[in-house]
Amino acid sequence: TFFGGVDRETLMAAERSANGDIVFAGYTWSDDLPTTAGAYQPRYRGNGDGYVAALDGSGSRLLFCTYLGGSGIENLHDMKLDNEGNIVLSGLTDSRDFPTTPGVLQRVYGGGDDDMFVAKLSGDGSRLLFGTYIGGAGWDEGYNLQLLGARGILVSGATNSDNFPVTAD
């Protein structure tokens, strides 16, 4: 099947859900993706946004489609489904208004060219469960992620920030 809008889409990750649906994610320059009723972000915010969508197991019906991003550029690089069917995402953004949530590691853009982001959407694409920047004064890019169950989320990427947030261990 085909999926997309008037410009270009880049597919970065896809997984089958526990019930056989196909969940996929990437980034787009199209402002007319077929977002669905109840989508977390039904409208394109500009300059390249992430997207997350799902098809039924036969690929014949779009279950949901939502954008994810701010007014700048978002490159969504990886996606995993957690044990509850929620959608965990990583990538990079240069948006100063990327959607973040209370209580996360970093609610404010760190500076430089771009920051890494990690976000979690509900399994139906209707709610942002959390969103955070991870970055310092340089460029910071999230490429891959692994879910570690109760231990958290492991994100790999690249940085040239000398003040990138690190842990002691």
Question: How would you describe each model-predicted region?
Answer:
Residues 1-169:
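A sequence-level/structural motif corresponding to short, flexible coil/turn segments enriched
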